[in-house]
């Protein structure tokens, strides 16, 4: 069991998570659109191996299962995982805190690694370090990482939105900052806005991105 101080928030939220994202008129107003865009950008084919970080209640995982993918998923919340197992019983799910020791379930390579409304829990240097680790250790050569999240085109847009006062424990993406941070790491990120405060990143080694991406 993780000792992450954020865990109680998600344990308490699990039972009402799906209802809350469907009725929200703010950040999660584009929730279904984000899910659809992550799936579209991933461009999967049946039989592909997909890893989801922060699987939550399984809303994204079940979409990849329905497309014939082999799905693995991790989350630090037992309550969230219990719901995800009901929705996507075919998926291989494990308890794991991204800030702690990574599960042996990740000791393999995947065609796609995806995350949705998860990585804003980490500051930008941690995000980029995590992306580098995933590419180096867990992504197949021609694979992609696709991330849907609270995100803005620029740091200025994020500042103008007032997002920096929403939650002091969260760190929201700005595409310009992210692309600059990836410079020199061998990664390149492409960003597609979905709403005024959400969007999807496709991340891959620069040589692969430049030769064509979803």
Predicted regions and their residues:
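Conserved class I S-adenosyl-L-methionine
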Residues: 1-43
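Short glycine-dipeptide loop
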Residues: 138-145
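Class I SAM-dependent methyltransferase SAM/SAH-binding core
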Residues: 51, 57-101
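Core SAM-dependent methyltransferase catalytic element
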Residues: 190-214
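A conserved beta-strand element that flanks and buttresses the S-adenosyl-L-methionine
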Residues: 114
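A short, conserved alpha-helix within the catalytic core of class I
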Residues: 122-134
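C-terminal alpha-helical "lid/dimerization" subdomain adjacent to the S-adenosyl-L-methionine
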Residues: 146-198
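Short catalytic micro-motifs in class I SAM-dependent methyltransferases
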Residues: 117-121
């Amino acid at each position: 069991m993780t000792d992450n101080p954020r865990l109680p928030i998600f344990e308490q939220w699990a039972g009402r998570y799906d209802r809350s994202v469907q009725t929200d008129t703010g950040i999660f107003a584009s929730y279904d659109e984000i899910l659809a865009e992550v799936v579209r950008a991933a461009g999967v084919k049946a039989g592909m191996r997909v890893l989801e970080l922060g699987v939550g209640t399984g809303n994204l995982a079940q979409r990849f299962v329905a497309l014939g993918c082999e799905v693995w998923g991790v989350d630090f919340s037992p309550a969230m995982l219990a719901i995800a197992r009901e929705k996507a019983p075919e998926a291989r799910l494990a308890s794991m805190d991204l800030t702690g020791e990574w599960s042996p379930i990740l000791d393999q390579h995947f065609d796609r690694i995806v995350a949705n409304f998860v990585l804003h829990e980490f500051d930008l240097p941690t995000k980029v370090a995590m992306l580098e680790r995933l590419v180096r250790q867990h992504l197949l050569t021609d694979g992609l990482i696709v991330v849907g999240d609270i995100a803005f085109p620029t740091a200025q847009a994020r500042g103008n939105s007032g997002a920096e006062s929403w939650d002091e424990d969260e760190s929201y993406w700005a595409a310009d900052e992210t692309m600059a941070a990836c410079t020199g790491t061998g990664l390149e990120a492409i960003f597609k806005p979905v709403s005024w405060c959400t969007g999807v990143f496709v991340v891959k080694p620069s040589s692969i991105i430049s030769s064509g991406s979803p």
